[in-house]
Amino acid sequence: STLDRSSAASDVYKRQTTDMQDPNRTLLGLNQRAWLTQQLASSKATWQVLGQQVLMSKMLVPAEMLQVLSAISSGAVTPEVLAQVNQLIKELVEIKLRYLNHDPSLTVEQLSRIKTVVPYNLDSWDGYAVERETLYGTLQYLNKKVVVLAGDTHNAWASDLHDLTGQFVGVELATSSVSSPGMEKYLSIPIQQLKEFESAFTTLIDELSYCNLNQRGYLKVRFTAEQVQADWIFVDTIKNKEYIVDETRSHQVILDPTLLPVSALKQTA
């Protein structure tokens, strides 16, 4: 099958944009949002830590890429589709890298391909964009930054959070699942290709700095007065009582109280 990555992608973009901007959509509810605002306002702690279930970062992918992900997750994983996926990702990443390097030769059409973005999961905070912006506005007003802890997706993520004006408001540290399957099952594509997806995701999704899409494990976060250290830890298998920590895929981030990196260690197979 051949994927149409133009008209349908545009329709999805228009429909989802309208829904996301509905001010009546709420993930917290009025009472919980008021409680959270009061807690943030009264807190004297060094760290403002928000533990909750779903991703808060803007996980916005090029609209045509969302079509590909939908096709794959529906089970349409044929050699032809995989070849199209590879080509599409290669094209989008190349355009995005040229854009980041301020390439003046990019065409309007090419720029549109990477700037026409849609959320891939409206059950997360991306589906409640107005309320998320309200929360970010509260943080800005209080002159506080937040460390958001998340899960839900069964995959590991790290992101920098920004409001719609581009102001940095915090970081998100999201854990993988201990045993439940992640994208390695839902996308049903080879592990090596998933690793290529990881690289593509961190290039194409502006807020995303790290992801692991195929391994099970946990996230260990340690707070001191001087820094927060996050360690993503993965095991080589969950199908056997005998397992080892896969140190080749570990990831560590250390941040100071302003949430700027003290150091970062990446080891990616």
Regions found by a protein language model. Give the residues of each.
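His/acidic metal-ligating clusters that form di-metal
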Residues: 10-156
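Extracellular/periplasmic catalytic domains that process cell-envelope and extracellular macromolecules
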Residues: 41-44, 140-142, 164-167, 212, ...
